[in-house]
């Protein structure tokens, strides 16, 4: 009986998801300046824009690249580099180019040829997360289903993978007992990599001091303050010795690598009422950071007074797995997770007056809801070169590259707009 009910619930949910998607698709021309939808061969659990951009002469597009991975059933997995053509601001297109069948537009009726897989490198098991090293973006670290963290220099691998399926990382980083997701390169100290794991620990490696012969590098330091799965870890963006970590013990911890006590953080705070899955430091304000949780909220923190949560962003209907500040705007951050939504928030709007109708759509600081995914969003990344462009990937193989309509973030058009979920008001 319970099975029947579960099947019925699933069918109802699927119908709701499909209906919502239809409404979203119908409204994309009003909500977006760009939407590209691409079905990957396998779902990617990870997405990160590389920092470089090519602007070919005489063309109305620029070429950007992404680091992706695969999560296959039983087939060979790969670390993937893809290229994406984004239209220039002056590219000629209008709403008549909109392809209502696919819910895509932006001068590209369809995306064929606009998103291409450039490099595939054999990987051991799915790629839980992949992140490039800021000082040398050819170097990419990956989290595997085993306890090892792998490092690849993608310039040293053929663009087509060896059919044998053999995985040949340039380095293999040891120190964990279990898999995990959190991964962070120090933006101020080249080669310093942090990793978070299900084994309750955080490992630090320095790959700049690696002997040329050995492929295996042992952790320089192991931090053991958390009492449960460590979900995410992130270096502070300005202070080379500070980093933060979050875990299933519901805590946010701030660490200083100069301290000799690797089992006690400088600060520890009960951040949420459920597991804490992600964190992000603000690139413009050295004291501000955000955390996302299974309690469905994003919390805002000030390092100068962690006892007091600055704000709680509430609108998600399920667990939050990723939070990222915009690289271009001090007050903008985005969050995503199990509810298939990516929410963009604007701190500067906290506490603004709202009409009762607007309040029904969400708090004033909820700037936009990206409703284009029909499955859990695994990861997303703000494009560092094109403001407001985001790439998001979901569990059903879909990758979307999109940019909300300018009138949404440029506030002039506030009358009779479209509510963030895409139902016209």
Swiss-Prot record:
Gene3D superfamilies: YVTN repeat-like/Quinoprotein amine dehydrogenase. Pfam families: CAF1C_H4-bd, WD40. Its main location: nucleus. SMART domains: WD40 (SM00320). It comes from the Eukaryota. It is found in: Nucleus; Chromosome, Telomere. Keywords: Acetylation, Cell cycle, Chaperone, Chromatin regulator, Chromosome, DNA damage, DNA repair, DNA replication, Nucleus, Repeat, Repressor, Telomere, Transcription, Transcription regulation, WD repeat. GO terms for biological process: DNA repair; DNA replication; DNA replication-dependent chromatin assembly. WD repeats lie at residues 32-125, 126-175, 176-223, 225-270, 271-314, 315-371, 372-404. The modification N-acetylalanine is found at residue 2. One of its GO terms (cellular component) is NuRD complex. Core histone-binding subunit that may target chromatin assembly factors, chromatin remodeling factors and histone deacetylases to their histone substrates in a manner that is regulated by nucleosomal DNA. Component of several complexes which regulate chromatin metabolism. Binds directly to histone H4, probably via helix 1 of the histone fold, a region that is not accessible when histone H4 is in chromatin. Forms a large corepressor complex that contains ncor1, sin3a and possibly sin3b, histone deacetylases hdac2, hdac1, rbbp4 and possibly rbbp7. Belongs to the WD repeat RBAP46/RBAP48/MSI1 family. This is Histone-binding protein RBBP4. It comes from Xenopus tropicalis (Western clawed frog). The lineage of its organism: Eukaryota, Metazoa, Chordata, Craniata, Vertebrata.
